[in-house]
């Protein structure tokens, strides 16, 4: 039979309310009594009933992590980094519920969660943000700057980061630099393309319209996009890929064409995924602190304070 608060109270010679307060960190209990109760709870292998605890504290012990989309437009490494970061920020009592917006707002019951970490990827996501705020849901938005009031937003300057990637190639004397970008409505795609174009403009360079290809944020998409670039009469001498998955696909296409990176063609990715260390050659990539951003999102969930995450690039 499971040990209850009443069992601990009987052993400790105190009321069950005192035990409850001690286990929940109340300052109404003396340090001596709290230590005694915590020791007994450990000895008796007490495990809290989260449902009962939630009723008392008006908590669900559940955090919803919501993505714009899970089935497409979201790279697996990005998804995993987000979930790892959020998980690190939570206490052992909490559960994660993972959802996306594909089924429509009518399928969301935000009252089942104590708060929402929304990994936003596009402007149309604002509808969900307003929906959550209208329900007085505690909300933190990760990955996109939000101009709405009373929204905690954690993001990074992706335009500057993309400029950094292109400047890396320019500093190595590449001049015909192409871009394999993600889906056009995704905010990261918009910002990274803007950074690519800005860096070229600052270097008094332009790129042909067919130097920008959509790789769909996937390995297969990067492979096909690189094949299209290599098929051009005037081929690029370097490529900036807006995420690492596309860069890996591009690398495969380059190798299949009998070319080598970086001697024949330069290549830079984005996100600093672990797998980039294990390609041949290892991929140069721009670091985006996705996991740290998501972790900070979990930590800030109940603090309604707008904050821009500082630049944090390797």
For the regions a language model picked out, list residue spans one by one.
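Short gly/ser/thr-rich secondary-structure transition/capping motifs
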Residues: 43-49, 98-101, 120-121, 251
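Short acidic capping loops at alpha-helix termini that bridge into adjacent secondary structure
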Residues: 176, 207-211, 261-266
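Flexible loop/turn connectors
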Residues: 227-314
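N-terminal helix-turn-helix DNA-binding module of bacterial transcription factors
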Residues: 1-61
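Hinge/beta->alpha junction and helix N-cap segments in small-molecule ligand-binding domains
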Residues: 68-81, 98-104, 154-164, 180-225, ...
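Short acidic/polar active-site loop segments enriched in Thr and Asp
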Residues: 15, 61, 114, 174-176, ...
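Alpha-helical recognition/docking segments in bacterial nutrient-uptake
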Residues: 58, 62-167, 230-231
